[in-house]
């Protein structure tokens, strides 16, 4: 074949490839082409075996030149092993001598200890395919008679050569890839290895303390030194830091190998290359740019050493670092003549090296970047391009996942302080944060507030107590030592005599019970979270429910039940303190633009009146005679005006401030000159304040409606018609049944009705006096003849006001009066017959000869009425008392009580038992709110009045004690009963667990300051703990009563550095073999197999892996919150209208179905679609964990478990599940990370808590596919224990290899990466059970300060806080031209 013919061919395709043919001929010594001529016959497939042999020869000629030219080979001893396929197991044994120290103090010398260590070879099989066309093979062996034949011949050679070159190149890359993976398999992460290899740590053994130290050091090194190149970029001494890290890498690995003193690779000047850094192109450029390079080439062997086989055992032909040339020489010197004259090592080396003149291997210069790190010379290389060309992921690029967390809505405890001297305008200590400002990966400032979390907070799963009760039942099946015994259920009274009920209950009572609600309310946050309070804390598992244990039939005798807390104010003050509630009150004022009508001075006047021990008792008589009837007020207006004016003139205080109706009537009828302008203005301001609060409530509630019901009924209890005022004088039941559609019931004694039409038998409506003139005789007969104790009828007047007056009345009795009196009020019953006797049966009243204009005291004899008038310092006329006595004609006989029950709000309707679906209240019919009675007036009052503690706001035991000596004896005998929180009330009157108002609200009323803000606070405390209320409060930026722990998992693409010490791995390269895989009519497919073997020749871990640089953050690090409506589409509220309203308001995914049919999840009936586009990368899903607002902010400033309690149990026994579970869940033990408390979040850390049942897959929730939960890894009990066992085993395995107990021939332990190491590296939060704090602030001003004053920024500013990012990824924050790193 002449060159001219090639040049003149008409196809330019051949011209560019001519040199390739020449190169192939030279490299194969033209033997390949001659060998193909042996393929004779028409069908080349008949001679397949011959071709395989020839192909093997060809492949063997040009194989693996490139691997020896890589710097990766520095870490290897590369040996050709032609009979590798015959090896079944390859092992090397060598000895380890344990050094000893000679002592001169008389101690006995330590004997020499020697271990035989066994190294095992691992075989690797790499293979590739190539396909040769049958037509090309035929053309290759045909004769070339014409120019066209020559052209076809050249084309066939090119095609076959290209296929061969592809296969050879694949094998070359396969060898490099195999060796790199072998190195990675022996390269633990630096944060693990450096810690475990520290003799200062491991020499103490593996006790609990050492394990906990190790975990702490893992975390410290992980945070401080991961991605060290990024940290060095902005460090002041970046070069020194990088050099320190590289030096630590080189010093940490084991540099001792079996081949002592071997130096296969050196610099051109002869310096030994100590190791190699394998990394990515980007990291390599950064390193060389920062450190510079000391050389650009190294000198290494140009060919492989040789190994031989004897039987089934691998026998090394490398001794003391030099290659044995022939097996015969080995046998003659070491095997066949073992008894020859002993020779020195030098003689052996000389003899080995002298054979065949091959004492020195051929060596060549290899291009490579070389750096100098301390006293070590290290080669630096990137093999990334090889993987990029092959479109295969580079093993040194990894995806790491880090979990972050930050709080939303925390409340800073008193005293409020600031560590900033630059922030201005955010000093208001009442400014309660309802948001968190975070920075995403593109430095965009984002706000996470409660609006973002509504798709989780409003889901039915959050409002369902049954999973928590079931989990508690499973976790604590045995009855606790102390079960709740008081206030659980209301009992029907057998009669209507309230005085007798009080007497029967308190007479001889010497035992008192304190409910769990009261105990939690009276405790401080630290006391409740202390391990000593674990029995109480165990049932504090849900922010929306009060759980308690009751006796149940069965061997274990316990059942767990829950009742809804109903309102934000009912959350115990230890978890929602008074200061926090006042911050919410301030938010309510801001949202409603509320301008108070009353001021602190007005409230102080009311409080002084309530605390006045000489409060006029005549006021109670007048109030009883009027009992809410406007006509009677008008009749007695002169007397009322006289009492008001006299009391104001004498003391500067207000009369009748305990009665809403009296204040309303005063404002309506006593204007002008009836009373002084100043005192009348006070009454007007009080009434105006109530109206202003009602208008603010309506304004904040908005104008939406749900199923033709105003949304205010779902947001605030004061607007809910199911809640009635506590004192009833008129027939409010008609309006009640008309407005309420939630199965309302009215219980009078042992009678119950559920509709207004059925109330005729239990309701006696009394009309005006002028309309009852002809029935006075009947009224008198009924009063005298009836058995009123068993007359189950309520005596009420006609209700003539607008329905909204009930809202005003509720605001007065549930907000204004408790706040202004600090709860020092008690319900009071009246015996109207005795009151009439004291009032009317006096001479001047009936004697017509007495002038009606005369002062009655001039004619009144000594008696009850005279004493009361003198004590009240009031001098009415005779006509005034006569008119007052006339009011008795239509008065009821005595004070009664009724029980009203309704089903709860649809958002609160799910319950553990049937009675918990109802909420009740006791109404005091024709009763009054009484202040303390003075000792002087007590004898007279005892004959007419008696205490009726029927409501948490109206059950002050100290006030009741002034009305009833028996109660006074009771509270003196049991001091704990002097507190309204613990005061026991007859179960026939009320039961706290079933009430609207509970101990926490009474506690706030007791302790609040007499200011207008306290009024707003009490109004806001009536906001419901319901999903509709959450939506409303989020819209108005009002705190819902609980904080959030937001958890997010972000993914990072990391570029890693692998450091390997020299000659630490022996690589055996066998011969390739070719097999025919597939034969078709047009082509033959061959598979080239190649066997390799590797053996770790180091005496320890010779390689180490370090994440050096963040290539990219793939997730957006944003505020996209989990949509539980999409995650759990099968769970819905029973009220369909409310459910659809919520989904619309929160922006939940609108599924393709509305029913809770789980089959939709299985047949693709439900699909969760993301946004149509992305701006910052993949959305990182945030999940929220409900958290008490009292959670310690410092907890979130360092890496911790989002559960609120440490979960990393590496210091426990690995397979002792009981010990591990106690560590995680037993709150009678302190949190191992914070000894002074058991948890920071009882709603998530305990078994059966809300967070536990929401994110713990152990409870087998039916979840939609394709949704990721970042919280699950911190809550799933089985995974917790499994990962902790994995971490325990990982530490133990590494310690076994590094801690002074070397592997022996009996243990066969190898220095490889332990199972779980990759998970630890890529998901450290999973093993450590901790999330990292991310940069967040409760106020944007703190972020601005952080960007402007990096060194002096404020982590705390009154009620605001800043949390710095403490994580392995050190981000550069940028806003405008301001940079913070």
UniProtKB/Swiss-Prot annotation:
InterPro entries: Herpes_MCP, Herpes_MCP_upper_sf. The gene is MCP. It comes from the Viruses. Keywords: Capsid protein, Host nucleus, T=16 icosahedral capsid protein, Virion. It comes from Equine herpesvirus 2 (strain 86/87). GO terms for molecular function: structural molecule activity. The keyword Oxidoreductase does not apply. Belongs to the herpesviridae major capsid protein family. Pfam families: Herpes_MCP. This is Major capsid protein. The lineage of its organism: Viruses, Duplodnaviria, Heunggongvirae, Peploviricota, Herviviricetes. Coiled coil: none annotated. Homomultimer. Makes the hexons and eleven out of twelve pentons. Interacts with triplex proteins 1/TRX1 and 2/TRX2; adjacent capsomers are linked together in groups of three by triplexes, heterotrimeric complexes composed of one molecule of TRX1 and two molecules of TRX2. Interacts with scaffold protein; this interaction allows efficient MCP transport to the host nucleus. Interacts with capsid vertex component 2/CVC2. Interacts with the small capsomere-interacting protein/SCP. GO terms for cellular component: host cell nucleus; T=16 icosahedral viral capsid. Self-assembles to form an icosahedral capsid with a T=16 symmetry, about 200 nm in diameter, and consisting of 150 hexons and 12 pentons (total of 162 capsomers). Hexons form the edges and faces of the capsid and are each composed of six MCP molecules. In contrast, one penton is found at each of the 12 vertices. Eleven of the pentons are MCP pentamers, while the last vertex is occupied by the portal complex. It is found in: Virion; Host nucleus.
């Amino acid at each position: 074949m002449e060159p001219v013919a090639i040049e003149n061919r008409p196809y330019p395709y051949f011209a560019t490839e001519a040199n390739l043919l020449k190169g192939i001929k030279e490299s194969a010594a033209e033997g390949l082409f001659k060998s193909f001529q042996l393929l004779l016959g028409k069908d080349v497939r008949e001679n397949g075996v011959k071709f395989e042999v020839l192909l093997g020869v060809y492949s063997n000629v040009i194989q693996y030149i490139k691997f020896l030219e890589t710097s990766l080979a520095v870490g290897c001893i590369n040996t050709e092993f032609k009979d590798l396929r015959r090896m079944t197991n390859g092992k090397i044994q060598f000895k380890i001598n344990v050094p000893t120290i000679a002592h001169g103090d008389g101690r006995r010398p330590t004997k020499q200890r020697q271990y035989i260590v066994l190294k095992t070879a691992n075989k690797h099989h790499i293979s590739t395919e190539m396909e040769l066309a049958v037509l090309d093979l035929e053309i290759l062996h045909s004769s070339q008679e014409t120019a066209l034949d020559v052209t076809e011949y050249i084309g066939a050679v090119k095609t076959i050569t290209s296929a061969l070159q592809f296969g050879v190149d694949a094998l070359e890359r396969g060898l490099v890839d195999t060796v790199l993976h072998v190195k990675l398999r022996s390269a633990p992460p630096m944060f693990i290895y450096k810690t475990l290899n520290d003799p200062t740590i491991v020499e103490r053994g593996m006790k609990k303390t050492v394990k906990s130290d190790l975990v702490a050091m893992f975390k410290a090194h992980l945070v401080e030194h991961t991605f060290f190149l990024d940290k060095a970029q902005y460090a002041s001494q970046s070069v020194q830091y990088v050099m320190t890290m590289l030096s630590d890498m080189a010093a940490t690995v084991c540099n001792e190998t079996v081949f002592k003193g071997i130096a296969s690779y050196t610099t051109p000047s002869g310096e030994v290359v100590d190791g190699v850094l394998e990394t990515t192109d980007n990291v390599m450029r950064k390193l060389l740019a920062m450190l510079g390079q000391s050389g650009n080439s190294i000198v290494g062997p140009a060919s492989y050493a040789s190994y031989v086989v004897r039987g089934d055992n691998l026998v090394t032909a490398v001794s003391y670092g030099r290659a044995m040339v022939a097996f015969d020489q080995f046998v003659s010197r070491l095997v066949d003549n073992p008894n020859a004259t002993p020779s020195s090592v030098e003689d052996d080396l000389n003899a080995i090296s002298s054979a065949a003149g091959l004492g020195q291997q051929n060596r060549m210069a290899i291009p490579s970047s070389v750096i100098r790190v301390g006293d070590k010379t290290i080669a630096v290389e990137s093999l990334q391009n090889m993987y990029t060309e092959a479109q295969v992921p580079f093993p040194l690029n990894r995806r790491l996942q880090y979990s972050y967390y930050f709080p939303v809505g925390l409340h800073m405890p008193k005293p409020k302080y600031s560590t900033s001297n630059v922030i201005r305008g955010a000093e208001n200590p009442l400014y309660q944060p309802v948001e968190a400002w975070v920075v995403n990966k593109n430095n965009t400032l984002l706000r996470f507030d409660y609006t973002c979390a509504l798709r989780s907070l409003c889901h039915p799963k959050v409002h369902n107590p049954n999973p928590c009760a079931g989990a508690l039942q499973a976790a604590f099946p045995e009855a606790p030592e102390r079960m709740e015994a008081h206030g659980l259920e209301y009992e029907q009274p057998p009669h209507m005599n309230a005085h007798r009920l009080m007497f029967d209950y308190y007479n001889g009572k010497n035992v008192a019970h304190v409910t769990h609600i009261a105990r939690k309310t009276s405790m401080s946050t630290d006391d409740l979270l202390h391990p000593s309070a674990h029995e109480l804390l165990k049932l504090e598992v849900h922010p929306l429910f009060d759980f308690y244990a009751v006796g149940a039939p069965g061997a274990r005798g316990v059942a767990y039940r829950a009742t809804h807390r109903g309102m934000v104010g009912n959350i115990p003050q230890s978890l929602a303190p008074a200061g926090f509630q006042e911050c919410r009150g301030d938010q309510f004022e801001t949202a409603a633009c509320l301008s108070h009508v009353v001021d602190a001075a007005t409230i102080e006047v009311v409080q002084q009146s309530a605390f006045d021990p000489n409060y006029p008792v005549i006021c109670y008589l007048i109030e009883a005679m009027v009992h809410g009837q406007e006509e009677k007020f008008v009749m007695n207006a002169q007397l009322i005006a006289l009492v008001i004016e006299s009391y104001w003139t004498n003391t500067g205080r207000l009369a009748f401030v305990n009665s809403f109706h009296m204040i309303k009537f005063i404002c309506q009828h006593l204007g002008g000159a009836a009373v002084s302008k100043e005192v009348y203005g006070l009454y007007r301001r009080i009434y105006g304040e109530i109206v202003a609060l009602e208008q603010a409530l309506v304004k904040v509630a908005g104008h939406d409606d749900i199923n033709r019901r105003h949304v205010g009924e779902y947001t605030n209890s004061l607007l809910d018609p199911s809640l009635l005022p506590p004192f009833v004088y008129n027939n409010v039941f008609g309006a009640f049944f008309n407005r309420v559609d939630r199965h309302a019931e009215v219980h009078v004694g042992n009678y119950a009705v559920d509709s207004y039409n059925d109330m005729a038998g239990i309701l006696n409506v009394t009309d005006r006096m002028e309309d009852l003139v002809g029935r006075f005789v009947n009224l008198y007969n009924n009063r005298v003849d009836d058995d009123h104790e068993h007359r189950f009828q309520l005596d009420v007047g006609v209700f003539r006001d607008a329905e909204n007056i009930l809202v005003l009345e509720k605001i007065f009795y549930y907000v204004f009066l408790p706040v202004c009196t600090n709860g020092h009020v008690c319900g009071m019953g009246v015996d109207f017959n005795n009151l009439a006797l004291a009032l009317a049966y006096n001479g001047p009243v009936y004697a017509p000869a007495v002038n009606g204009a005369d002062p009655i005291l001039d004619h009144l004899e000594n008696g009850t009425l005279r004493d009361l008038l003198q004590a009240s310092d009031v001098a009415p006329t005779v006509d005034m008392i006569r008119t007052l006595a006339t009011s008795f004609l239509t008065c009821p006989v005595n004070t009664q009580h009724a029980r009203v029950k309704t089903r709860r709000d649809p958002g609160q309707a799910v319950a553990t038992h049937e009675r918990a679906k109802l909420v009740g209240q006791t109404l005091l019919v024709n009763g009054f709110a009484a202040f303390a009675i003075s000792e002087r007036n007590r004898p007279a009052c005892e004959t007419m009045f008696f205490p009726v503690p029927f409501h948490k706001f109206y059950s002050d035991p100290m006030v009741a004690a002034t009305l009833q000596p028996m109660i006074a004896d009771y509270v003196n005998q049991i001091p704990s009963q002097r507190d309204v929180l613990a005061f026991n009330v007859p179960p026939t009157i009320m039961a706290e667990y079933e009430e609207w108002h509970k101990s926490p609200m009474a506690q706030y009323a007791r302790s609040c300051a007499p200011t207008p803000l306290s009024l707003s606070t009490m109004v806001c405390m009536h906001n419901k703990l319901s999903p509709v209320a959450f939506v409303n409060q989020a819209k108005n930026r009002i705190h819902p009563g609980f904080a959030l722990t937001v958890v997010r998992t972000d993914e990072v693409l990391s570029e890693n550095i692998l450091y390997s010490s020299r000659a630490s791995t022996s690589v055996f390269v066998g011969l390739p073999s070719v097999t025919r895989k597939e034969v078709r009519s047009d082509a033959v497919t061959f598979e080239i197999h190649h066997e390799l073997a590797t053996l770790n020749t180091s005496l320890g871990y010779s390689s180490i892996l370090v994440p050096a640089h963040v290539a990219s953050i793939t997730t957006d690090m944003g505020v996209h919150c989990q949509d539980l409506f999409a995650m759990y589409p099968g769970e819905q509220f029973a009220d369909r209208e409310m459910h659809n309203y919520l989904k619309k308001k929160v922006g939940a995914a609108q599924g393709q179905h509305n029913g809770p049919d789980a089959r939709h999840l299985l047949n693709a009936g439900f699909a969760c679609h993301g946004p149509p586009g992305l701006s910052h990368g993949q959305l990182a899903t945030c999940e929220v964990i409900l958290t008490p607002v009292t959670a310690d902010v410092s907890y979130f400033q360092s890496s911790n478990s989002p559960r609120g309690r440490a979960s990393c149990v590496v210091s426990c026994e690995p397979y002792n599940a009981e010990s591990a579970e106690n560590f995680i869940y037993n709150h009678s033990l302190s949190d191992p990370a914070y000894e002074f408390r058991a948890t920071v979040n009882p709603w998530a850390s305990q078994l059966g808590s809300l967070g536990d049942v929401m994110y713990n897959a152990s409870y087998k929730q039916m979840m939609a596919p394709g949704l990721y939960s970042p919280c699950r890894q911190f809550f799933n009990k089985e995974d917790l224990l499994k990962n902790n066992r994995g971490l325990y085993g990982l530490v133990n395995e590494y310690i076994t290899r590094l801690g002074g107990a070397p592997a022996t021939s009996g243990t066969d332990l190898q220095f490889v990466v332990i199972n779980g190491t990759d998970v630890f590296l890529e998901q450290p939060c999973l093993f450590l059970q901790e999330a990292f704090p991310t940069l967040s602030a409760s106020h944007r001003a703190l972020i601005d300060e952080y960007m402007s004053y990096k060194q002096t920024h404020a982590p705390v500013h009154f009620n605001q806080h800043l949390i710095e990012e403490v994580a392995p990824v050190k981000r550069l924050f940028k806003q405008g031209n301001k940079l913070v790193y």
